[in-house]
């Protein structure tokens, strides 16, 4: 975590944090390791999501979000505590190739995500199509569905050949497509 580049260390956030705790996070040698500052950041983003959710759901609408993969990774990487957000569905961006992982990582990330939402929302595994071509395509789908995903979404693809493969896969598994 680099204050100058990756996360907000603006004057307003620092002042509000100081009002709560009596200290400026930048006074710490390693602010990125200060649990109070981390919690402040997690809570700040969660409050924004809660306000949006109240408005959207107050209008009777369904609310979903594309989030970073796996709640623990999202908390660490981008301060998204999305496992505690009041959404109806989550699309964790489980781009296994981006993280130099195989299709098995998709299953682990889905399992963690499903556990975090504990039945109160659907998990749709967000898959990066170029990462799951060839034999990895069905392996990735198995990993997602076998670990509790309600479905999958594709980022950057798939092409017509893989759409045919997807339909055949869903038919074999007995899944009924949503309208």
State where each predicted segment sits.
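Short, composition-biased local secondary-structure segments
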Residues: 23-25, 111-114
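Polysaccharide-binding and catalytic clefts of secreted carbohydrate-active enzymes
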Residues: 1-87, 93-100
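Residues that form generic nucleotide/phosphate-binding pockets
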Residues: 16, 20, 116, 169
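Substrate-binding cleft of secreted/luminal carbohydrate-active enzymes
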Residues: 87-105, 109-113, 119-179
């Amino acid at each position: 975590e680099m204050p100058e580049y990756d996360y907000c260390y603006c004057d307003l956030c620092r002042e509000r944090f100081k009002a709560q705790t009596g200290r400026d996070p930048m006074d710490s040698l390693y602010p990125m390791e200060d649990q109070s500052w981390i919690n402040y950041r997690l809570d700040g983003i969660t409050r924004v999501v809660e306000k949006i959710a109240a408005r959207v759901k107050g209008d009777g609408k369904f609310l979903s979000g594309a989030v970073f993969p796996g709640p623990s990774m999202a908390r660490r990487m981008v301060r998204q505590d999305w496992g505690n957000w009041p959404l109806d569905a989550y699309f964790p961006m489980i781009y296994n190739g981006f993280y130099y992982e195989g299709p098995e990582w998709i299953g682990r990330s889905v399992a963690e995500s499903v556990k975090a939402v504990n039945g109160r929302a659907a998990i749709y595994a967000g898959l990066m199509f170029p990462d799951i071509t060839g034999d990895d395509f069905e392996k990735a789908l198995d990993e997602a569905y076998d670990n509790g995903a309600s479905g999958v979404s594709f980022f950057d693809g798939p092409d017509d050949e893989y759409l045919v493969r997807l339909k055949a896969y869903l038919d074999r598994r007995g899944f009924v497509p949503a309208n």
